[in-house]
Amino acid sequence: MAAGPRTSMLLAFALLCLPWTQEVGAFPAMPLSSLFANAVLRAQHLHQLAADTYKEFERAYIPEGQRYSIQNAQAAFCFSETIPAPTGKDEAQQRSDVELLRFSLLLIQSWLGPVQFLSRVFTNSLVFGTSDRVYEKLKDLEEGIQALMRELEDGSPRAGQILKQTYDKFDTNMRSDDALLKNYGLLSCFKKDLHKAETYLRVMKCRRFVESSCAF
């Protein structure tokens, strides 16, 4: 009975270690189903990492009585709220795969700059020990999304057609209340944006490859 979950975990780990299809000379082309499975696993991992980091930051720096009011004030703070991206699964299902990939790429690229400051801000290795690897994980997911775009668009992704935007960098002055609130807001947006990217990828994967695990 224990073999099933263990096999699934080993398969998930193996997929996370797979290269993307850019190394054409060294590896054969990866099936589209594997590209989607790989991207979904990476997005899930990043979303969980973002959620855990947000929760630990909140626990360490934000008094419990202030959290709800601060979260409400930050509702319109995220850049992703200013673009016509789907806000949930139902809306995502109304968009084409190419549209969803472009929105996913935009969300990922908007964080490539800011997350490079994570390891400077969150120096507690017990709480934020993986923060210095977030950039590499985002770059890896970016490559995976671009590989999917090449497959579905039958050519190179037209990145120039996407309005590129980025968030402010994280503030390293953790003794300032303003800096704490800014970083809290950024982490909230990071978690929200990674959840959107994960949702888009899962919607695409499920409608292309019917699975029993599509409910989410």
From Swiss-Prot:
Signal peptide: 1-26
Function: Plays an important role in growth control. Its major role in stimulating body growth is to stimulate the liver and other tissues to secrete IGF1. It stimulates both the differentiation and proliferation of myoblasts. It also stimulates amino acid uptake and protein synthesis in muscle and other tissues.
Lineage, broadest ranks: Eukaryota, Metazoa, Chordata, Craniata, Vertebrata
Record protein name field: Somatotropin
GO cellular component, one term: extracellular space
Gene3D superfamilies: 1.20.1250.10
Any GO BP: animal organ development
Domain of life: Eukaryota
